[in-house]
């Protein structure tokens, strides 16, 4: 996901996406804790996506 794509979305869409990413992060953390996570890179990828969405939300709130 790219920041340019996120800037085109509305605040409601960004909030929905943020909620979905937080759920994904929770599920990945649970898989890691139980030893079921085979692709550990997904944790950092989701973390970065969450940061991107939050950054765009803050930028839009400042306008």
From Swiss-Prot:
GO molecular function: structural constituent of ribosome
PROSITE patterns, per the entry: RIBOSOMAL_L29 (PS00579)
Gene3D superfamilies hit by this protein: 1.10.287.310
Domain of life, source organism: Bacteria
Listed SUPFAM superfamilies: Ribosomal protein L29 (L29p)
GO BP of this protein: translation
Recorded family membership: Belongs to the universal ribosomal protein uL29 family.
Protein name: Large ribosomal subunit protein uL29
Species: Pseudomonas aeruginosa (strain ATCC 15692 / DSM 22644 / CIP 104116 / JCM 14847 / LMG 12228 / 1C / PRS 101 / PAO1)
């Amino acid at each position: 996901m790219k920041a340019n794509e996120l800037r085109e979305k509305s605040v409601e869409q960004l909030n929905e996406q943020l909620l979905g990413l937080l759920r994904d992060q929770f599920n990945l953390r649970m898989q890691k804790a139980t030893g079921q996570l085979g692709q550990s890179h997904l944790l950092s990828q989701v973390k970065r996506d969450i940061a991107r969405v939050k950054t765009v939300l803050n930028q839009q709130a400042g306008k």
